[in-house]
């Protein structure tokens, strides 16, 4: 099991435009062991951390049956989400979690 309180670096594998200020970020945890042991259920969220800026709670929107892929759909509305919106595929951010009760 992954320690949800540690920040785990993740690479943006794809940035998918959903609407003018909304993007889905397909993330991949950088550490192989963390990736292998990371599990979540529908309804949970991660704290998405941008180094030097802060963090924000974002729901995991990917399939729990594919835990090595972490998708988060983010609307650019505040300081942290606006900074995340500037990132592109290949860049790194941090993930803490998962948190919350699944369905």
Residue ranges and their predicted role:
Residues 2-91:
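Ferredoxin-reductase
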Residues 88-100:
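Acidic-glycine-rich active-site phosphate/pyrophosphate-binding loop
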Residues 52-55, 97-102:
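Short, charged beta-turn/beta-strand-edge "cap" motif at the junction between a beta-strand
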């Amino acid at each position: 099991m992954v320690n949800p309180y540690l920040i785990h670096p993740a690479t943006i594998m794809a940035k998918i435009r959903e609407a003018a200020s909304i993007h889905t970020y397909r993330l991949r945890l950088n550490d192989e062991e963390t990736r292998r042991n990371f599990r979540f259920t529908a309804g949970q969220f991660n704290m998405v951390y941008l180094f030097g800026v802060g963090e924000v709670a974002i729901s995991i929107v990917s399939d729990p049956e594919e835990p090595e892929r972490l998708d988060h759909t983010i609307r650019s509305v505040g300081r942290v989400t606006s900074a995340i919106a500037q990132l592109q595929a290949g860049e790194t951010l941090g993930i803490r979690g998962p948190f919350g009760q699944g369905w």
